[in-house]
């Protein structure tokens, strides 16, 4: 059994209509480092109903430098309740208007959010949901440094202030 999907879809352009189907089994995977890094996703791309993440501990660079598609869907079972490292997870990403983080995008146990959204471009609103929190002691160095809200660059005095960013994108 595999324990890592590291780099699986890195730096590829997924074809129009591509979906992760029911035969793609991620149960037991602990490491999704770089899984979709640099990936260009087709419009409406979904991780689907079989993309298990409940056992994953490491999502470093998972979507680093990717172009997240319009109407991207994390799927019904995307669960980050055991993830401890989200370093650079969405860094240098293009994040579409209306991106909704799933209900099970839970971050209370994450200890490293260093550069999580560094230099990302938010093209509009984003719904982080209620489970996305920053716990005391979590490394948030440069979490939002040099991010763009449309054409406006974030003032770096807020580069570690999740509540400020969340209010700006709501």
Tell what function each PLM region has.
Residues 1-170:
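Negatively charged
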